[in-house]
Amino acid sequence: MAKTNPGNFFEDYSIGQVLHHAVPRTVTNGERALYHALYPARHALYSSDEFARNCGLPQSPIDDLAAFHVVFGKTVPDISLNAVANLGYAEGRWLQPVYPGDTLRSESQVIGLKQNSNGKTGVVWVRTRGLNQRDEVVIEYVRWVMVRKSNLDAPAPETVVPDLKPALSVDDLVVPQGLDFSKYDFVQSGQSDRWDAYKTEETIDHVDGVTVEEAEHMLATRLWQNTAKVHFDLTTRPEGRLIYGGHVISMARALSFNGLANAQMIVGLNDGAHANPCFAGDTIKAWSQVLDKAETGVPGVGALRLRLVATKGGAPFALRGDDGKYLPDVLLDLDYWALMPI
């Protein structure tokens, strides 16, 4: 019997199947330091223990996306090792902060299956949960992936497409216990604009750009213990190593500091598309659009629903062509909720 893991293929999944992913990961300030070295992340809540304590938290949490990448990375050997593409995200929620010293593990349940008409691939929907050492859920999200079949003669499963929310409402969002922006320091945060300064449909060009390097993107992907072959093996694609989509997400979020410095905590993920592939040598820029805004149930804490778009060129705020398809320079279209002082 083979002792190596070839990964799961489409025919290996079944509705209701639960996957317990190896290996647990204790996150420390080492991950924080590397995260801030790999991305120009500057949001104050994740940079300063004193700033975080002034906002009612016990210390500075691990960056929301760093925690997401750890949880996501655990799922790759079981879900996307044989994937053709990661197709989308929905119903993502950050339920409580992750602090240095927390140990994270991941588990997923298959909630949807649909074989493609070519008979060679199919789409798998999974709901993934990240849990800490106290078995508390810290992150949950749905994603769907196109996965290859190994046995092309395997019968197609019954098609089940989950009914997912098009977007989370403000009532679905969880404000971390103790979060209090009444003593928020706008000088130290780097920007004076509060929640009420942002208007629905407003667009923000984040101006700065970062060129992706081969060594950096592979270091980042290894940091999250993401084992997907396409990110490392030069022989898997004629164009070269594909940049992990999460690398683009984190880069764009970090660039958004210039214009959204007070959008401190990501608490919801409504939708996301990796519109076009990213490769080393591409220069990532970003822009945002305010889609919605709402007051949370916590006094002084507002929520902004933001579209974050990462590009590798083209005009700011350009997204789709006349045919409705993403323009070739668009890398990422992400829809998320963030908390901001009112």
Predicted regions and their residues:
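HotDog/MaoC-like acyl-thioester-processing domains
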Residues: M1-I15, V98-P176, A280, W287-I342
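Hot-dog-fold acyl-thioester-processing enzymes
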Residues: M1-L87, I139, S150-L269, K325-D333, ...
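Short, structured motif recognition centered on aromatic/hydrophobic residues
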Residues: Y35, Y89, L104-S108, V124-T128, ...
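Short amphipathic alpha-helical patches
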Residues: P58-I62, W94-Y99, E158, A275-F279
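A cross-kingdom feature marking solvent-exposed beta-strand/loop segments within repeated
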Residues: A85-Q96, V110-G112, M265-C278, L291
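Generic recognition of flexible, low-complexity loop/linker segments
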Residues: P238, H274, A294-E295
